UniProtKB/Swiss-Prot annotation:
This is Light-independent protochlorophyllide reductase subunit B. One of its GO terms (biological process) is light-independent chlorophyll biosynthetic process. Keywords: 4Fe-4S, ATP-binding, Chlorophyll biosynthesis, Chloroplast, Iron, Iron-sulfur, Metal-binding, Nucleotide-binding, Oxidoreductase, Photosynthesis, Plastid. One of its GO terms (molecular function) is ATP binding. It comes from Equisetum scirpoides (Dwarf-scouring rush). The lineage of its organism: Eukaryota, Viridiplantae, Streptophyta, Embryophyta, Tracheophyta. The gene is chlB. Its EC number is 1.3.7.7. Binds 1 [4Fe-4S] cluster per heterodimer. The cluster is bound at the heterodimer interface by residues from both subunits. Belongs to the ChlB/BchB/BchZ family. It is an enzyme of class 1 (oxidoreductase). Signal peptide: none annotated. Protochlorophyllide reductase is composed of three subunits; ChlL, ChlN and ChlB. Forms a heterotetramer of two ChlB and two ChlN subunits. It comes from the Eukaryota. It is found in: Plastid, Chloroplast.
Length: 103
């Protein structure tokens, strides 16, 4: 959650964390989904991709390499729609470099 906020990404919904059936109506508003735990959410993400064309990210941002890969996947998915809706693209490489500089 904090990582996405650091990148300036607005979180649409966190399911199942504190969510109810009423929150499900907001799911199609997301540009992509994140499935940090395959045991919880993979079936839903697969359904949303199949029926609504909504991509998902399976990489869990733990450790330097997986976190960098996760951020690059977020960037790829954001940049599919950002030029149309926000009239710009995003480059998170400087964030990755800064976060890994002293490790």
């Amino acid at each position: 959650k904090r990582l996405l906020e650091d990148l300036g990404i607005k979180i649409n919904e966190i399911i199942p964390e504190g969510a109810s059936v009423k929150n499900l109506i907001n799911l199609p508003q997301a540009w992509f989904n994140i499935v940090p735990y395959r045991e919880v959410g993979l079936m839903t993400a697969s359904f949303l991709q199949k029926d609504f064309g909504m991509p998902y990210i399976l990489t869990t941002p733990m450790g330097i390499i997986d976190t960098a890969d996760f951020i690059r996947q977020v960037q790829k998915n954001v940049n599919k729609l950002a030029p149309f809706f926000l009239k710009k693209t995003f480059d998170f490489e400087s964030y990755i470099d800064y976060q890994t500089k002293f490790v």
